[in-house]
């Protein structure tokens, strides 16, 4: 090898495998070569060696790199330097350019793109490669398929396409597209043939989804990994028309059915039926989801990204229908698969030595029902085994682990039998045996999709068989490649020597010899007491010695492993499970149970197994076994022997056909699109034999060129006189071309052993093409240099002449320009200096002004600060003086208020007397006018109604006076003697006034009697009044001025009477009432007026007023006839707010007509009624009834506020102001009543709910933590969801909704905390952890519905956090003490006193902490034990902040059926 400076080469790299580099130094002194390489990553490597020829002695020497023209070649055998890095780089370069296929001689290397490349397999691509030679187009698997098809057509020989590679490399997809290509090839042009071809194509392609569903699974390396080998034969007749197809399968991975490692899955079909079956069928088969079954939930995540299992199920069932399996048979298959899932869920009980299984076990019953077998016998043979001797049958019990193995063996037996039956049914559909008898099948093309070499951390029986199959295929591949090389050399008649290549025959002999691994495994499997350990010891004694120890070895540690040196890598196998997997059998008892099945599909499957056993001849083993009875050799063959036999048959088929190879490569383990992992690809190239093929090619003549190609490429390497007459003469004979090629070779290559000239080609040893390319490049460089020299000389001569001419013309122009430029520069310089002077002066002046301004601002700020400090001190002094004056004047103001209260009482009495006298005078005038004008009887009636209200006010005033007198008498004892005498004098005068008031009361009673007489008179003269009213209407139409003026004056007088009485009596009564309730206020404070009617004469309706005055009528109708008869359970969305609509309608009418007294009494009666209804609700209706009435009652304050807003907007006279005062009182009073009803109901409801669902026991009871906690919480969450639904149903507004939830949590917080410190005998950190976990579950339900859940539970949360914290000393406790802000020291002490260590080794609460808490409590005078009381007035906020919403919702139409008076009021009010 030559390593001149500048030579490109490859150097080993730990992360990339190989990295490119360039020789930057090559020195030789003292017999040693000193090389220096600069790698592509910038690193420099120094190498010292004595020779460049022997690479084995110098493993660190770099490897020469191919010229760039050859690096992305589509055939690796054309590389000049055929070495490992050259092959890897060529594949990588093509892959990164989107070219996933590369030839390596007869092998097609296919790199998985992990991306959608559907354009590579379209119908147009199939047509492009049809009838084309392999080397005409880019590498493609269609080219391999076309080559196989053409070989079959022209050479009349059977073909085989071997697709191999590791899991995830794309074998299954490649095989699928090859099948599609063969199924799409059509030679016949007749219409009948096209129809038949379409049907066959569909059936052949339909086998793919079926085989993938039942034989593929998700693994860590591949989402769709084939877990079995498959050999598909597409059969052709003499006219190359597809006549059918046959499928052979090899070694289905049965263990995957019962065990899947993490992140892996069971076979796809189980997940497809669980997602795709209709719900009625799933219920019939008792199926739910993959996580519910042991056979599908071991791998974790059951879903595959981007895969719709329901859609895959549809594809699978359609494919089954296409190959002749009807819907009923499919349902039978799914029933068997469902039975397998239920078998995996069978649970056995474990005793000390045995396992037991009841025939009543639920999963057992379901599985036996689906399979149509007897549950008793099936359960029996799961936990028992039968040993047959010459004289008797012995039944023994199995231990728990053996019973599990027996259960899983049954499942594996059923699934493998189902898989074989499915393959046989597909073959019956795709292939008619009569075709062979009628000689219709002329040839076939086989597609072998088989597992690649596998090497995991733990390798078992499946990996052993897979690697054994790959050893056989690799041996056949090497022999095939060597055979092709020999044929090429013989055909070209060149001299060649025998090529040595690594033969893996010793490894194959180790496995399959008569005393090989498989034979010893079969021998041990046939022994009843055979075990994995015994078999391992036999392997060590048989093979751990020469010559077998070259391919077999024993690990340094352990007695349960052995190592086999395969062609790819040494693999360490675990012997555990080999014997059981090799036996692959179920008990005779289970077979007898299965034979009695009533499931027709299951019976067909078992019958098919018997036919397979009858058709397969038993393996004849003539070798005499020592210590093995003859009867044992007559048992059924083991799985290993069957696999060995089927593999031998497969190799026989392959050897009888012309083989084409496709090696699939997995470029990265993460399955990322278009990413290339060098180390991973290198390991696969070694494992699949590509590098071995290249080594065989390198041993011969890997590079070959035809004579014409060689001449066209390298003619430049000879003298012009030799190639000028040959290159342009197309009729030149072959001998002249060959002689010219010999001339080129003689002139360039001195060693004739480096090449051979054949009949049509020239063959080169490895590296010769690179050498010729280097010579050609150097020659081309020399020629280019000569051409460039001549062209550049001509170019620069012309350029020089043109330049000189231009220079002469430009010099004169430039000189004149320079003068002008110099003058212009001097002028501009002078101007610039002047301009700079002015600008700099301006800058300096501005800078000076800015500095002065900033200094002034700073001075102002400082002065302002000093003045403000002085003013603040003065204000503080003034404030202190004011506070002192207020404190000193408090006593004097108290005396003043006492005197003022007495004077107001006297003034009230005087005003009452004056009002009474004024009323008598006005009453007499009204009576005289009523006698003169009978048609004015209506106005008199209104005055009488006003008397009624006045009497009521007088009675209330009398009561107030009595109470005030008592109050004054109690206060006199505290007044000094001088003041007491003054008070007694005032009281005596006031008593005189009282006596006068009593006289006034008697006179009012007389007036009432007169009123009754007037009513009687009204009834007698009704006809007269009617006629007068008609006359009045007529007179009104004519508008007589005299009568109109008289009526108007009468109305004005009546209004004046009402105003005077209202003002006098209102002021008096309100003062008395205010004194009674709140005491005397500050002087000048506004006095609240007394509630009176403010009837509006101008807008009143006599009929409506008469109805509204009859308070008892409609009050009883609403309360007794409507509210108490509401059935909450029958309330729907249309009449949820019916009660509040009725109430607000009546109140609105009363307020609008000025009947404030009637409105107040009506509201009081309604509120009392609702309160009694809520308080008397039975326990089972507490939630529904309470929420219904609270939802309605909460609208009443909002209604009052809305009405108040309307009156405030309208402004108005004194009557409107009185109405506003009433509405304000109505809003406040209804809020208080609502708060009272709400608080009482909430406590009652929570007590009932707590007793019903055991909330506090659920959270705090330690026994529930391990037993029925989940069930209890499910009950709690069901209750809370129902509670939430009821709130929504009865249209509780969002703000009130949130308040109810918050108050509920506050109640729970108080009760849980009190129960924690009173009912729990002992506390520890485990208990605190469990309580905290339960509280978190409670919080998780409330958090999506309200904000700030945790502050409502702060006490109980902090209490359990205290239990969970480990506090070892007082310093730690002091650091944490401030974080428990919601608890006082007494409460913390109560919790810590109850703390008991959970374990023996755990320390209790240090005494210094308890002593510290005791001192804090003593210092702050706190009471023990710190129990929090449920004070609803303090704990539950007022509803006032939660009832701000639009009242339009209460104006909905409600059913007023049965409310005659209310309906009439509504009707008249609307008029």
UniProtKB/Swiss-Prot annotation:
Q: Which PROSITE patterns match?
A: DILUTE, IQ, MYOSIN_MOTOR, SH3_LIKE
UniProt keywords, alphabetically: Actin-binding, ATP-binding, Calmodulin-binding, Coiled coil, Motor protein, mRNA transport, Myosin, Nucleotide-binding, Repeat, Transport
Segments forming a coiled coil: 938-1063
Cellular location(s): Bud
- Where is the IQ domain positioned along the sequence? 781-801, 804-824, 829-849, 876-898, 899-928
Ranges for domain Myosin motor come to 71-777
Q: Reply yes or no: does the keyword Zinc-finger apply.
A: no
Record GO biological process: actin filament organization; endoplasmic reticulum inheritance; intracellular mRNA localization; mating type switching; mRNA transport; vesicle transport along actin filament
| One cellular component (GO) term of this entry | cytoplasm
Q: Which GO terms describe its molecular function?
A: actin filament binding; ATP binding; calmodulin binding; microfilament motor activity
Provide the phenotype resulting from gene inactivation: Abnormal localization of ASH1 protein to daughter cell, with protein mislocalized to mother and daughter. Decreases HO mRNA level.
Membrane-crossing residues? none
- Write down the Gene3D superfamilies for this protein, in alphabetical order: 1.10.10.820, 1.20.5.190, 1.20.5.4820, 1.20.58.530, Kinesin motor domain, Myosin VI head, motor domain, U50 subdomain
InterPro entries recorded: Dilute_dom, IQ_motif_EF-hand-BS, Kinesin_motor_dom_sf, Myosin_head_motor_dom-like, Myosin_N, MYSc_Myo5, P-loop_NTPase
Q: List positions binding ATP.
A: 165-172
Outline the segment boundaries, as ranges, of region: Actin-binding: 647-669
Q: Does the keyword Repeat apply?
A: yes
Outline the extent of the Myosin N-terminal SH3-like domain: 4-57
Every Dilute domain range:
1164-1419
Function, as annotated: Part of the mRNA localization machinery that restricts accumulation of certain proteins to the bud and in the daughter cell. Recruited to specific mRNAs including the ASH1 mRNA, coding for a repressor of the HO endonuclease, via its interaction with SHE3.
Q: Per its UniProt record, what PANTHER family does this chain match?
A: DILUTE CLASS UNCONVENTIONAL MYOSIN, ISOFORM C, MYOSIN
Give the UniProt family note: Belongs to the TRAFAC class myosin-kinesin ATPase superfamily. Myosin family.
Q: Provide the assembly information.
A: Interacts with SHE2 and SHE3.
Quote additional remarks. Present with 2210 molecules/cell in log phase SD medium.
Question: What is this protein's record name?
Answer: Myosin-4
Please name the source species: Saccharomyces cerevisiae (strain ATCC 204508 / S288c) (Baker's yeast)
């Amino acid at each position: 090898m030559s390593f001149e400076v500048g030579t490109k080469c490859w150097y080993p790299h730990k992360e990339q495998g190989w990295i490119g580099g360039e020789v930057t130094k090559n020195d030789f002194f003292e017999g040693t070569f000193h090389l220096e390489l600069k790698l592509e990553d910038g690193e420099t490597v120094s190498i010292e060696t004595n020779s460049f020829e022997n690479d084995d002695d110098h493993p660190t020497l770099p490897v020469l790199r191919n010229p760039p023209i050859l690096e992305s070649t589509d055939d690796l055998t054309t590389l000049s330097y055929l070495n490992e890095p050259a092959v890897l780089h060529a594949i990588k370069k093509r892959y990164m350019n989107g070219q996933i296929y590369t030839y390596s001689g007869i092998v097609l290397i296919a790199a998985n793109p992990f991306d959608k490349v559907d354009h590579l397999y379209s119908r147009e691509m199939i047509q492009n490669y049809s009838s084309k030679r392999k080397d005409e187009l880019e590498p493609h698997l269609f080219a391999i398929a076309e080559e196989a098809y053409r070989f079959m057509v022209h050479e009349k020989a059977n073909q085989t396409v071997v697709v191999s590679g590791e899991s995830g490399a794309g074998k299954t997809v490649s095989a699928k597209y090859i099948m599609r290509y063969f199924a799409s090839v059509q030679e016949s042009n007749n219409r009948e043939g096209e129809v038949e071809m379409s049907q066959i194509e569909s059936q052949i392609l339909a086998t793919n989804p079926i085989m993938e569903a039942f034989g593929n699974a998700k693994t860590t390396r591949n989402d769709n990994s084939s877990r079995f080998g498959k050999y598909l034969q597409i059969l052709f007749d003499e006219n190359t028309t597809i006549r059918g197809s046959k499928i052979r399968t090899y070694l289905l991975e049965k263990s995957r059915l019962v065990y899947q490692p993490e992140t892996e899955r069971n076979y796809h079909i189980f997940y497809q039926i669980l997602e795709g079956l209709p719900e009625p069928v799933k219920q019939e088969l008792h199926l739910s989801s993959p996580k519910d079954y042991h056979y599908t939930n071991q791998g974790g995540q059951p879903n595959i990204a981007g895969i719709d299992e329901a859609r895959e199920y549809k594809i699978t069932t359609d494919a089954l229908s296409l190959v002749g399996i009807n819907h009923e048979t499919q349902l039978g298959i799914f029933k068997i698969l469902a039975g397998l899932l239920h078998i995996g869920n069978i649970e056995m009980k474990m005793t000390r030595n045995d396992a037991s299984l009841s025939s009543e076990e639920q999963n057992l019953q379901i599985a036996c029902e689906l399979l149509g077998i007897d549950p008793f016998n099936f359960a029996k043979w799961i936990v028992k085994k039968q040993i047959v001797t010459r004289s008797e049958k012995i039944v023994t019990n199995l231990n728990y682990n053996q019973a599990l193995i027996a259960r899983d063996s049954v499942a594996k037996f059923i699934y493998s039998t189902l898989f074989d039956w499915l393959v046989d049914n597909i073959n019956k559909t795709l292939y008619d045996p009569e075709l062979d008898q009628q000689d219709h099948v002329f040839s076939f093309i086989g597609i072998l999709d088989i597992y690649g070499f596998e090497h995991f951390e733990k390798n078992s029986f499946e990996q052993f068989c897979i690697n054994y199959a790959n050893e056989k295929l690799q041996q056949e591949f090497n022999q095939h490649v060597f055979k092709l090389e020999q044929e090429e050399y013989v055909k070209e008649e060149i001299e060649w020597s025998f090529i040595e290549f690594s033969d893996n025959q010793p490894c194959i002999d180790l496995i399959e010899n008569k005393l090989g691994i498989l034979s010893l495994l079969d021998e041990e499997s046939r022994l009843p007491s055979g075990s994995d350990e015994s078999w391992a010891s036999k392997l060590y004694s048989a093979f751990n010695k020469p010559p077998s120890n070259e391919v077999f070895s024993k690990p340094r540690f352990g007695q349960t492993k052995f190592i086999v040196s395969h062609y790819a890598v040494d693999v360490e196998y675990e012997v555990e499970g080999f014997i059981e997997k090799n036996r692959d059998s179920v008990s005779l008892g289970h077979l007898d149970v299965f034979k009695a099945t009533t499931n027709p599909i299951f019976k067909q499957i078992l019958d098919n197994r018997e036919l397979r056993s009858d058709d397969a001849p038993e393996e004849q083993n003539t070798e005499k076994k020592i210590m093995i009875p003859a009867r044992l050799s007559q048992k059924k063959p083991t799985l290993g022997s069957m696999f060995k036999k089927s593999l031998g048959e497969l190799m026989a088929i392959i050897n009888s056909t012309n083989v084409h190879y496709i090696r699939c490569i997995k470029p990265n383990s993460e399955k990322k699109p278009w990413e290339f992992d060098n180390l991973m690809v290198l390991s696969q190239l070694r494992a699949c034999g590509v590098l071995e093929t290249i080594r065989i090619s390198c041993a011969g003549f890997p590079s070959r060129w035809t004579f014409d190609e060689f001449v066209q490429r390298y003619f430049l390497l000879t003298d012009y006189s030799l190639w000028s007459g040959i290159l342009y003469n197309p009729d030149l004979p072959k001998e002249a071309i060959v002689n010219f090629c010999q001339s080129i070779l003689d002139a360039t290559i001195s060693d004739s052993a480096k090449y051979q000239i054949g009949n049509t080609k020239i063959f080169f040893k490895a590296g010769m093409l690179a050498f010729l390319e280097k010579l050609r490049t150097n020659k081309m460089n020399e020629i280019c240099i000569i051409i460039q020299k001549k062209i550049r000389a001509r170019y620069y001569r012309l350029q020089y002449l043109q330049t000189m001419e231009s220079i002469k013309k430009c010099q004169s122009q430039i000189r004149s320009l320079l003068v002008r430029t110099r003058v212009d520069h001097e002028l501009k310089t002078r101007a610039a200096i002047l301009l700079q002077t002015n600008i700099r002066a301006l800058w300096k002046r501005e800078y000076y002004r800015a500095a002065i301004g900033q200094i002034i601002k700073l001075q102002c700020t400082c002065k302002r600060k000093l003045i403000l400090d002085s003013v603040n001190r003065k204000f503080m002094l003034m404030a202190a003086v004011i506070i002192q004056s207020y404190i000193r004047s408090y006593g004097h103001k108290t005396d003043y208020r006492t005197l003022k209260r007495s004077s107001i009482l006297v003034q009230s009495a005087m005003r009452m007397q004056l009002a009474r006298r004024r009323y008598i005078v006005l009453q007499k005038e009204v009576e005289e006018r009523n006698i003169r004008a009978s048609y004015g009887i209506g106005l008199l009636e209104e005055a009488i109604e006003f008397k009624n209200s006045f009497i009521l006010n007088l009675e209330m005033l009398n009561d107030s006076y009595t109470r005030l007198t008592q109050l004054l008498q109690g206060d006199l004892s505290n007044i000094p003697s001088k003041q007491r005498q003054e008070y007694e004098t005032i009281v005596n005068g006031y008593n005189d006034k009282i006596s006068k008031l009593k006289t006034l009361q008697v006179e009012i009673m007389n007036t009432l009697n007169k009123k009754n007489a007037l009513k009687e008179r009204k009834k007698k003269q009704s006809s007269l009044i009617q006629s007068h009213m008609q006359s009045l209407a007529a007179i009104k139409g004519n508008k007589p001025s005299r009568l109109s003026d008289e009526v108007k004056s009468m109305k004005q007088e009546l209004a004046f009477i009402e105003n005077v009485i209202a003002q006098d009596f209102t002021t008096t009564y309100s003062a008395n009432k205010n004194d009674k309730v709140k005491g005397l206020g500050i002087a000048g404070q506004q006095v609240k007026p007394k509630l009176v009617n403010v009837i509006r004469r101008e807008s009143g309706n006599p009929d409506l007023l008469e109805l509204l005055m009859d308070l008892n009528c409609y009050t009883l109708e609403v309360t007794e006839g409507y509210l108490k008869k509401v059935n909450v359970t029958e309330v729907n969305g249309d009449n949820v707010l019916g009660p509040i609509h009725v109430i607000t309608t009546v109140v609105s009418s009363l307020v609008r007509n000025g009947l404030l007294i009637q409105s107040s009494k009506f509201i009081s009666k309604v509120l009392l009624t609702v309160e009694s209804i809520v308080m008397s609700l039975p326990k089972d209706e507490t939630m529904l009834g309470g929420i219904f009435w609270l939802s309605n009652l909460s609208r009443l304050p909002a209604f009052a506020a809305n009405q108040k807003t309307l009156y405030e907007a309208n402004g108005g006279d004194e009557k409107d102001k009185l109405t506003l005062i009433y509405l304000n009182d109505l809003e406040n009073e209804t809020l208080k009543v609502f708060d009272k009803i709400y608080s009482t109901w909430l406590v009652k409801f929570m007590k009932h709910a707590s007793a019903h669902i055991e909330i506090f026991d659920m959270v705090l009871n330690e026994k529930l933590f391990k037993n029925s906690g989940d069930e209890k919480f499910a009950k709690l969450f069901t209750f809370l969801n129902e509670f939430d639904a009821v709130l929504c149903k009865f249209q509780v507004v969002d703000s009130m909704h949130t308040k109810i939830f918050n108050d509920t949590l506050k109640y729970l917080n108080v009760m849980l905390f009190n129960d924690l410190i009173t009912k729990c005998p002992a506390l520890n950190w485990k208990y605190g952890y469990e309580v905290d976990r339960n509280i978190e579950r409670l919080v998780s339900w409330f958090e999506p519905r309200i904000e700030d859940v945790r502050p409502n539970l702060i006490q109980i949360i902090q209490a359990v956090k205290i239990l969970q914290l480990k506090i070892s000393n007082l310093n730690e406790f002091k650091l944490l003490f401030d974080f428990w802000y919601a608890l006082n020291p007494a409460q913390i002490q109560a919790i810590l006193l109850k703390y008991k260590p959970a374990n023996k080794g755990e320390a209790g609460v240090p005494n210094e902490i308890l002593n510290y808490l005791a001192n804090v409590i003593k210092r702050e005078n706190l009471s023990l034990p710190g129990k929090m009381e449920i004070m609803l007035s303090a704990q539950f906020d007022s509803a006032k902040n939660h009832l701000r919403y639009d009242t339009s919702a209460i104006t909905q139409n409600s059913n007023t059926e049965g409310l005659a008076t209310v309906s009439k009021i509504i009707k008249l009010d609307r008029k």
